[in-house]
Amino acid sequence: MQSQQYSTPNLSLFNDGSAIIGEIRPIHGANQDVINDRALQLLQRTREHRNFLHRAHDDIRRYEPPTTQIDALENDEDENFYLNDMNTNEEYQSDRESVKSGLNSIANRYKNAVQSSPSDLDDIDFVGEEEQDLSYDESDYSDPLQEIDSNYRESPRRTTDKILKSSSKNYRRRENLGGEIRKIRQEKANKTATRYRPSDLALYEIRKYQQSTDLLISKIPFARLVKEVTDNFILENQHLQWHSMAILALQEASEAYLVGLLEHANLLALHAKRITLMKKDVQLARRIRGQFI
């Protein structure tokens, strides 16, 4: 649809503020017609260019000769219409001439073939050596994946041999492992189990903790306990943030205090001629220290 531009309406103003809209007149009618004609030419040119590109890039397209003389005449009319449609464009003059010459040569060969031997039309090559061969041959397009599969393809006999060899090796290895496992089980059954007394376990733990400098309490539960205790002493609007090194220092101090307290409580238990540490020993140790309330 052609669009036509219009000028702004003529307004007649009065003293009371009212206005009358005058006649709306088109601007430059001749120039608008020229623009519309140019737009139509450009649109037609783009369509022809697109159709030509589609025909030129169709690699699998074959030439199919007409079966009867009526079909040949209809094809000639379509070709002439296509060529006449391209006469308006100066860009495709050379392409038009080459296409026209090729089509004329094909038509002449077809006519000569019909006159000479109409029954052998399938065996005649209507396209000459100078024209481009647009026929599709599957041998020209090899599949790289198929080549890779063919390189790595093995016979079923070889694969079965490999499976048998691998399975026999695994079976022999499994038999050897089974014999070793049976020997170990027999040795364990014949050996008497060593029984450790509670004092041996205590001595082992004492040596273990004396040689290490690691913390005895895990860090995450201790940090949770510290935050719960501090929440009881702050207001609702306050919010404290703890550094990791501060919590680590508190944990070191608390563990040192507990170790010293338990040492004193253990001495009090030995003074009472006992080995087992009791609650009253810890309470007495705190009272002697002056920390009992």
UniProtKB/Swiss-Prot annotation:
GO terms for molecular function: DNA binding; protein heterodimerization activity; structural constituent of chromatin. Keywords: Centromere, Chromosome, DNA-binding, Nucleosome core, Nucleus, Ubl conjugation. Residues 150-164 have a biased composition (Basic and acidic residues). SUPFAM superfamilies: Histone-fold. Its main location: nucleus. It comes from the Eukaryota. PANTHER family: HISTONE H3.2. This is Histone H3-like centromeric protein CSE4. The lineage of its organism: Eukaryota, Fungi, Dikarya, Ascomycota, Saccharomycotina. The gene is CSE4.
